[in-house]
């Protein structure tokens, strides 16, 4: 089927270039463009696109406000474009919490160069985002248990954007691509009907991709500060984003959250974010677990890679690891979970109904590796009941 895309961006160059690239994809139809958030909301109502690409810093109405309004009046999967800066990361997490599905780095250099690589990336991402379960505004924000807040980190204030003249441009109609035949849905093998018994795990590993920032925030903000095991979080994310993500989770939760550093010993009550652009391994030092950070292997698609982290931990602590796979596209984590199971450890995965993208957890479940399949809201209580 042809996917209808609405492009919202105040940069005339970026808007035109993005439209050119998207229009060259046979099963994508750019149905309109907008130069600010207010126009984006109006055109979303009028055109009812399948996917909206959204900048965050725009005149009249910024991207985050536009996402909230779109989720209220015309819920539609939104793909954010964000700068690779601390401020870009901060507002991207706000946009994801408001209801956006995923994000891509906004690179004028990449957009002005060879389009073949960015074309493949955009095509894959837009197809995945179009399948996402969007969330209504208000219901999208993770509901956390009321807890004493940590001191808030100072929030950078950005300069007001320069005004830009509104420009909208409906795309010229093109021939529709022939409808694709529906693919058979993989069968999810039933997980064990009983709950896995409470165990004294040495480490809890959580792997996720698309939809993960909101899912992780929802889980971590419901865990007590005295959680009895360390958590290692592997989220597919650029290197410039993981420090800001760790700071956000640390500010919002009672756990201590930080980006993992090479050589540090994992401690209960702490959550460690695998740094972007590198691989995070867990090694054993006596009875303790220690972090080992390596430069990302160029042969691996994901940096950080869930399979790498899970696999490194499997033989170090046989039968003493809990692996959790949350929402995300692709199958990263399946082989790592297989290694955990082969060494006697336990695996939980997220269910289809509450996954933004049911890719990674489906890969684990269909391979028969999940001991429990849980809804997103069930993970925090199960972690509290099952770990310790």
UniProtKB/Swiss-Prot annotation:
Residues 137-196 are annotated as: Disordered. Residues 197-388 form the CheB-type methylesterase domain. NCBIfam families: PRK00742.1. Belongs to the CheB family. GO terms for biological process: chemotaxis. Involved in chemotaxis. Part of a chemotaxis signal transduction system that modulates chemotaxis in response to various stimuli. Catalyzes the demethylation of specific methylglutamate residues introduced into the chemoreceptors (methyl-accepting chemotaxis proteins or MCP) by CheR. Also mediates the irreversible deamidation of specific glutamine residues to glutamic acid. PROSITE patterns: CHEB, RESPONSE_REGULATORY. InterPro entries: CheB-like, CheB_C, CheY-like_superfamily, Sig_transdc_resp-reg_Me-estase, Sig_transdc_resp-reg_receiver. Its EC number is 3.1.1.61, 3.5.1.44. It is an enzyme of class 3 (hydrolase). HAMAP family: CheB_chemtxs. Phosphorylated by CheA. Phosphorylation of the N-terminal regulatory domain activates the methylesterase activity. One of its GO terms (molecular function) is protein-glutamate methylesterase activity. One of its GO terms (cellular component) is cytoplasm. The keyword Cytoplasm applies. Its main location: cytoplasm. Contains a C-terminal catalytic domain, and an N-terminal region which modulates catalytic activity. Residues 148-164 have a biased composition (Pro residues). It comes from the Bacteria. It is found in: Cytoplasm. It holds the Pfam family Response_reg. Residues 4-121 form the Response regulatory domain. It comes from Hahella chejuensis (strain KCTC 2396). This is Protein-glutamate methylesterase/protein-glutamine glutaminase 4. Keywords: Chemotaxis, Cytoplasm, Hydrolase, Phosphoprotein. The modification 4-aspartylphosphate is found at residue 55.
């Amino acid at each position: 089927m042809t996917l209808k895309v609405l492009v919202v961006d105040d940069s005339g160059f970026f808007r035109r270039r993005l439209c050119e690239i998207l229009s060259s994809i046979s099963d994508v139809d750019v149905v309109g463009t907008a130069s600010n958030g207010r126009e984006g909301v109006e055109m979303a109502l009028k055109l009812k696109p399948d996917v909206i690409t959204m900048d965050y810093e725009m005149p009249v109405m910024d991207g985050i406000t536009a996402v909230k309004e779109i989720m209220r009046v015309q819920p539609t999967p939104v793909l954010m474009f964000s700068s690779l800066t601390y401020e870009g990361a901060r507002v991207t997490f706000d946009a994801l919490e408001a209801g956006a599905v995923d994000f891509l780095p906004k690179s004028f250099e990449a957009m002005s160069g060879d389009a073949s690589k960015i074309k493949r990336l955009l095509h894959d991402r837009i197809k995945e985002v179009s399948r996402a379960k969007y969330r209504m505004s208000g219901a999208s924000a993770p509901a956390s248990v009321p807890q004493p807040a940590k001191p808030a980190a100072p929030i950078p204030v950005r300069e007001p954007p320069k005004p830009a003249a509104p420009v909208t441009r409906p795309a010229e109609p093109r021939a529709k691509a022939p409808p694709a035949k529906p693919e058979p849905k993989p069968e999810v093998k039933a997980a064990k009907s009983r709950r896995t018994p409470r165990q004294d795990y040495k480490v809890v590993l959580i792997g996720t991709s698309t939809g993960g920032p909101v899912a992780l925030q929802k889980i971590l903000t419901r865990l007590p500060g005295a959680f009895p095991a360390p958590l290692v979080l592997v989220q597919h994310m650029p290197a410039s984003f993981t420090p800001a993500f760790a700071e956000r989770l640390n500010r919002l939760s009672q756990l201590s959250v930080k980006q993992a550093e090479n050589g540090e010993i994992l401690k209960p009550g702490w959550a460690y974010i695998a740094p972007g652009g590198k691989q995070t391994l867990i090694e054993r030092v006596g009875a303790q677990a220690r972090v080992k950070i390596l430069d990302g292997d160029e042969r691996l698609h994901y940096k950080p890679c869930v399979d790498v982290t899970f696999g490194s931990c499997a033989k170090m602590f046989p039968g003493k690891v809990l692996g959790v796979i949350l929402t995300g596209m692709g199958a990263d984590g399946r082989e790592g979970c297989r290694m955990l199971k082969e060494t006697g450890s336990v695996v939980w995965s997220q269910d289809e109904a509450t996954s933004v993208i049911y890719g990674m957890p489906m890969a684990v479940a269909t391979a028969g590796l999940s001991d429990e399949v849980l809804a997103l809201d069930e993970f925090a209580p199960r972690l509290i009941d099952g770990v310790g």
